[in-house]
Amino acid sequence: MGQSKSKEEKGISGTSRAEILPDTTYLGPLNCKSCWQKFDSFSKCHDHYLCRHCLNLLLTSSDRCPLCKYPL
């Protein structure tokens, strides 16, 4: 007991591990920026997308988008 040799550590040399990134494919143009639901019909506002339902709601209140302040 106590006379066993410890195992040699095998170092990983020269290989880098893959960086783990969260799955963000559900963000971006696939979702409405106002309600964040996935829909089929989108309208492009200045730098984001709005679904048809949110676009109609926003147009009843103002000519400008409350998210980016550009004209709808």
Curated annotation (Swiss-Prot):
Keywords: Host cell membrane, Host cytoplasm, Host membrane, Host-virus interaction, Lipoprotein, Membrane, Metal-binding, Myristate, Virion, Zinc, Zinc-finger
Record membrane topology: Lipid-anchor
Zinc finger (RING-type): 32-68
Subcellular location: Virion; Host cytoplasm, Host perinuclear region; Host cell membrane
A Pfam family reported for this protein in Swiss-Prot or TrEMBL: zf-P11
Gene3D superfamilies (alphabetical): 3.30.160.310
Transmembrane portions of the chain: none
Lineage: superkingdom: Viruses
Record's comment on post-translational modification: Myristoylation is required for the role of RING finger protein Z in assembly and budding.
Keyword Lipoprotein among record annotations: yes
Primary location class: virion
GO cellular component entries: host cell perinuclear region of cytoplasm; host cell plasma membrane; membrane; virion component
GO molecular function: RNA binding; zinc ion binding
Lipidation, N-myristoyl glycine type: G2
InterPro entries: Z_RING-type_Znf_sf (IPR038485), Z_RING_Znf (IPR003224)
Function of the molecule: Plays a crucial role in virion assembly and budding. Expressed late in the virus life cycle, it acts as an inhibitor of viral transcription and RNA synthesis by interacting with the viral polymerase L. Presumably recruits the NP encapsidated genome to cellular membranes at budding sites via direct interaction with NP. Plays critical roles in the final steps of viral release by interacting with host TSG101, a member of the vacuolar protein-sorting pathway and using other cellular host proteins involved in vesicle formation pathway.
Domain remarks: The RING finger domain is essential for the inhibitory activity of protein Z in transcription and RNA replication.
Subunit description: Interacts with protein NP; this interaction probably directs the encapsidated genome to budding sites. Interacts (via RING-type zinc finger) with polymerase L; this interaction inhibits viral transcription and replication, Z partially blocks the product exit tunnel for the releasing nascent RNA product. Interacts with the glycoprotein complex; this interaction plays a role in virion budding.
Family of this protein: Belongs to the arenaviridae Z protein family.
Entry protein name: RING finger protein Z
Organism, scientific name: Lymphocytic choriomeningitis virus (strain Traub)
